[in-house]
A protein has these predicted regions:
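OB-fold and OB-like single-stranded nucleic-acid-recognition modules
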Residues: 1-114
Length: 114
């Protein structure tokens, strides 16, 4: 898999997966679900970035839960992927224990969740 690093606005407007760094404001309370492919627990929430709304999906079986609330400002690094008809999704917001992907994170109030 090849990950491209580009400006966030270009990645948001594009169609190919891209590794991104950006800031955003949390819009929704996190919901938790069990990933059918990863077989792990995830948290997901929406956030508004400078380019538009994104869904952040974080694997909390790998990284600690990030206690975000609507209105919080966060910094995010992860892989942005497009889902037709929905806002782009940003995942891999945690370290990769298998060392196959760059490490991502969510930073909230100065604390790193990775």
């Amino acid at each position: 898999m090849i990950l491209r690093k580009m400006g966030f606005a270009a990645a948001y407007a594009g169609t190919a997966p891209a590794w991104v760094d950006f800031t955003a404001r949390v819009l929704t309370v996190p919901r938790f679900f069990y990933g059918s492919r990863s077989h792990s627990v995830h948290e997901a929430f929406e956030a508004r970035s400078s380019a538009g709304v994104v869904e952040i999906v974080d694997n909390v079986s790998i990284a600690p839960r990030c206690p975000v609330q609507p209105g919080d400002c966060i910094e995010v690094r992860g892989q942005l992927v497009h889902d037709p008809g929905k806002p782009p999704l940003v995942h891999w917001t945690h370290h990769d224990p298998g060392h196959r992907h760059p490490d991502g994170f969510i930073r909230l109030r100065g604390r790193l969740y990775a």
